Each structure stands twice: as C-alpha cells, then as structure tokens.
Curated annotation (Swiss-Prot):
The lineage of its organism: Bacteria, Pseudomonadati, Pseudomonadota, Gammaproteobacteria, Vibrionales. It is found in: Cytoplasm. A double ring-shaped homohexamer of HslV is capped on each side by a ring-shaped HslU homohexamer. The assembly of the HslU/HslV complex is dependent on binding of ATP. ATP binds at I18, G60, V61, G62, K63, T64, E65, D256, E321, R393. This is ATP-dependent protease ATPase subunit HslU. It comes from Vibrio cholerae serotype O1 (strain ATCC 39541 / Classical Ogawa 395 / O395). SUPFAM superfamilies: P-loop containing nucleoside triphosphate hydrolases.
Length: 443
C-alpha cells in the first residue's frame, strides 16, 4: 500500500492531470486514510470505514484519468468498471458481485508478483546452477548415477563467470522445463463466469505438472528457469490469504458512468439496468461477504469511488440509500481554453511531446510554437462550445486532423523540419472551426 502523503499524491497527479484540485485533494485524502487506518489498534481499525467518493463533472475533464493514475500510485488492489456493464440479479448480464471477484483476481496477481520479486535473487542462483549443470553434466559412477558435483571446481567457476558476463547468452542448451498448461475454454451463459473459472481450474489441476526437454538459448533458459524456481519458493496458500487480506483492507473500486444507471422521473415500467443495479450495489458498498474462487471476501473496508457526467440525470436521481453511501461529493470543472493550452504542454508525455517523438522515428523534425499551441487550444475550445462538449478528448481529434498530412507523407519527408505555428493551424483548421456544420462531422 502507498505511504505517500496527500501533498505528494496531489503533486504526482499534477504531473499528468491539469486542474481539478478538489478532486485530487479528495482522492489523496481517501488514499492516505487507508494507510492511517492500518496504523490503528485492531479494535478501532474494524470500526473505521472508508468515506466513499462521488465525482461529478462533464465528460473529458479528467475523472477517468484520475482513476488511472491513482491505480498506479495506490500500490493496492484496484479495479475500474463501467456501471452500464451490469444488470440486476436474475437477468442476463454480469452481476455486480463479479466486481469483487475481479478485484480479488487483481490482488492475487499483484501479491504473486510481489512474492516473486522477494525470492527473485534466490531463484536466480538456483536457475544459474541448473544452467551450469546442463553445460557441465556431473560425471556418472559405475551404476550410472550422477556423482556429487564439485561446486567450486575451476572449470565451473570459469563458466559461471562467463555466464554472469553474458558471454554464453546465445549458446544453446537442453534443459527440462515445466510445460505450460493448455487452457481449457468453456462456453457458458452470461452470469456463470464464476462456475466457468472453477471448472477451468479443475481441468488444469487434473492435467498436473509435466516437464519436457527443450533446446533453447541460455538467456531464454535462464528466464524460464528463474520463473520456475521462484514459483517453487512461493507458498500459494499463504499468497491467497495475503491477497484476500489486501482486498479487504486496501482494495479500491472505481465505478465509472454511474449516472447512466439513474432512473429518470419520466421513465416508467421495468428498468433492468438501472434501479436494480443500484440496489445490488448497496450491499457491496455498505459491506457484505462475496464468495470468490480464492475464498470469502468481506467488502466493509473496500473504498468505492463513483463518477459520472450527470448531464441528463442529477446526483439526486440516484436512489437515496446509494446517495447516503457516497458521502463525499466532488465537482470537476469544465476545461477552459487556457486549460487546453496547459494540457498540450505541461503533463509528463504531453500530446505535443508524443507527436514530436513519433515523427522523430521517421527523421522528421516537428516543432510546436507557443502561438501555434494557443491556436490549437482555442480551436478545440471553440468546437466544444459550438458542438458537443467532449472536454480534453477534443484535442486528440484536432491534433490528428492537424498532423494528418505530415503523418501521411512522413516517410518521403525524412530530414525535413515543420514548424506548427498559428498560421499553420489556421490554414489547416480555420475553415472547419468557423463552419459549425463541418465541425460536427469532422472535428
């Protein structure tokens, strides 16, 4: 789990996301509170529940991007889901409990990677010995049995030195390696994913572990053997227990598009994918026990962050019980022309930086001037105002249109330089931006 302070979390998010300080602060505090809770005594820790967050804001302002970046910072089990993918229990479609099952799978994978990293050094030593055994097979006695190998023999040490220096990387050897188990694909109706997973696991266990002699280069053999030896050093049962503990205490679920499951007042009749899904989410957010293939998982201390544009529906259209379980409300602001300008230049691996790097692979030098960047930002903002406001995603559309000619002819224009200034942008986009009908279809 991340031990970063709220200020450090906000600072890290600022490297990738422009503006939206309120949302960043709320997320940073929620993430830090996970760490604070773990420092409490057991009796008090059980009572401290996470304060779930509802992020409200138009499309393309950074809600999903905050979730993506948070996943990398959290160093904890994290899953992002779309609320529209789920249906009420009893109907065809995914049930909301599959969120926790998927989160547990993520936790098992994360815990497995961490455990493998801890034993990596020892696994590398064991893999090295197996490669040396293949290079220098121990002599056999009269009964055909391999004699005790001499660990410190001069020949073995010479080969060990060469192996570590990479001099033997391309030499081929024959070794016994575990054969990857064949995947058994089972077709099942929607909603039966858990049973399908259990059956697949059963068939794979029946196959058992088999080894096969393979000829491979030493560098590939070392990689395969390190993984094999590391897997032997890891206790799978302990790993599952640790993963479930991680989910229950540090898990974070990000539910996007929650406004799409609001029941609008004028709609009547059965509403499979809306109010029913909200009611199914209630026990998960409030705290319940979900059965997964790794064991039972309690959701009492999992942090839920929901987000939605709420352009048609309002947060008050959510059922009251769900509103009460999302106590922290954060509004994200629409982006201005100045925000667009900052988005184009300030974040790490900004859009302009990406295009410059892509063209450099073709030996084409592209430079964006300050007035050119301002013109791009103004064009994107103007199109958003006159047509549908899709936020920062409009920059992708505008830039693709702007760079279309250079990208297409880049192979023939190697060694040339292009300056993207205000005049260049106006020449390529001016007419499209001015004509509202053209903007609707092209930008």
């Amino acid at each position: 789990m991340s031990e970063m302070t709220p200020r450090e979390i906000v600072s890290e998010l600022n490297r990738h996301i422009i503006g939206q300080d309120k949302a960043k602060r709320a997320v940073a505090i929620a993430l830090r509170n996970r760490w604070r809770r773990m420092q409490l005594e057991e009796s008090l820790r059980v009572e401290v529940t996470p304060k779930n967050i509802l992020m409200i804001g138009p499309t393309g302002v950074g809600k999903t991007e905050i979730a993506r970046r948070l996943a990398k910072l959290a160093n904890a089990p994290f899953i992002k889901v779309e609320a529209t993918k789920f249906t009420e229990v009893g109907y065809v479609g995914k049930e909301v409990e599959s969120i926790i099952r998927d989160l547990t799978d993520v936790a098992v994978k994360l815990t497995h990677q961490q455990a493998m990293e801890k034993v990596k050094f020892r696994a590398e030593e064991l893999a090295e010995e197996r490669v040396l055994d293949a290079l220098l097979p121990p002599p056999r006695d009269a009964w055909g049995q391999a004699e005790q190998k001499e660990e410190n023999s001069s020949t073995r040490q010479v080969f060990r030195k060469k192996l570590r220096e990479g001099q033997l990387n391309d030499k081929e050897i024959e070794i016994n390696v575990a054969v990857p188990q064949m995947g058994v694909e089972i077709m099942a109706p929607p909603g039966m994913e858990e049973m399908t997973n259990q059956l697949q696991g059963l068939f794979q266990n029946l196959a058992g572990d088999t080894k096969k002699k393979r000829k491979m280069k030493i560098k590939d053999a070392l990689k395969a053997l390190v993984e094999e030896e590391a897997a032997k050093l890891v206790n799978q049962e302990e790993l599952k227990e640790q993963a479930i503990y991680n989910v229950e205490n540090n898990g974070i679920v990000f539910i996007d598009e929650i406004d799409k499951i609001c029941k609008r007042g004028e709609v009547s009749g059965p509403d499979v994918s809306r109010e029913g899904v909200q009611r199914d989410l209630l026990p998960l957010i409030e705290g319940s026990t979900v059965s997964t293939k790794h064991g039972m998982v309690r959701t009492d201390h999992i942090l839920f962050i929901a987000s939605g544009a709420f352009q048609v529906a309002k947060p008050s259209d959510l059922i009251p019980e769900l509103q009460g379980r999302l106590p922290i409300r954060v509004e994200l602001e629409a982006l201005s022309s100045n925000d667009f300008k900052r988005i184009l230049t300030e974040p790490k691996a900004s859009l302009t930086e990406q295009y410059v790097a892509l063209m450099k692979t073709e030996q084409v030098d592209v430079q964006f001037t300050e007035d050119g960047i301002k013109q791009i930002a103004d064009a994107a903002w103007q199109v958003n105002e006159t047509t549908e406001n899709i936020g920062a995603r409009r920059l992708h559309t505008v830039l693709e249109r702007l760079m279309d000619e250079i990208s297409f002819d880049a192979t023939e224009k190697a060694g040339q330089a292009f300056v993207i200034d205000a005049a260049y942008v106006k020449a390529r986009l001016g007419e499209l931006v001015e004509d509202e009908d053209l903007s609707r279809f092209i930008l």
